[in-house]
Amino acid sequence: SFFRTERVQRMKKVFDNEVILPEVARLIEQGHSVTIPVRGNSMNPFLADGRDRVTLGGFIPEELQTGVTVLAKDAEGRFVLHRIIARRDDRLILQGDGNLRQTEETTPAQVAGKVIAVIRKGKRYAAGGVLWRTYSYCWVRLAPCRRYLLALYRRL
């Protein structure tokens, strides 16, 4: 028949972070926003591998405040998607939500982009929205209790 129903299968390509993230940084620098899947478990419980995607976009330095999640190069030149937990002079201290002690230091110049939205189960949540900002604020402030909260989360 003239019209034919074909099953179209969406191809999924997986690239190493070392390959894709420099390109993501370049696109953001050119003014684009880029959506990528979350990989790894360092941002649990708020961002989960295989469940969530984040949209990254540009920023102005004044937006790099405590609680904001950014894609940045650490001191070893690796890209990390972590939350800013403190600012010290011209340094940003980053930590994954699922990390209890490990932190990274970077500078605003090493930040490639900030998370502007989180996509979970097809629904988009603005990272600048009240709900997401409240979660971020509380999580950063709950650092002394985080060990117990993460243990509880991992048992669920």
Which residues does each PLM region occupy?
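Extracytoplasmic/periplasmic terminal helices and flexible tails
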Residues: 7, 113-156
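Short alpha-helical interface elements
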Residues: 49-53, 75, 95, 109, ...
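Feature for secretory/organellar precursors and membrane-associated catalytic proteins
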Residues: 12-100
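Short, Lys/Arg-enriched N-terminal segments with co-localized hydrophobic residues
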Residues: 1-10
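Aromatic- and Lys/Arg-enriched surface recognition patch
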Residues: 87-132
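Generic recognition of short, well-ordered alpha-helical interface segments
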Residues: 79, 106, 110, 144-147
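Short, surface-exposed, charged/polar-biased interaction segments
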Residues: 45, 49, 59, 64, ...
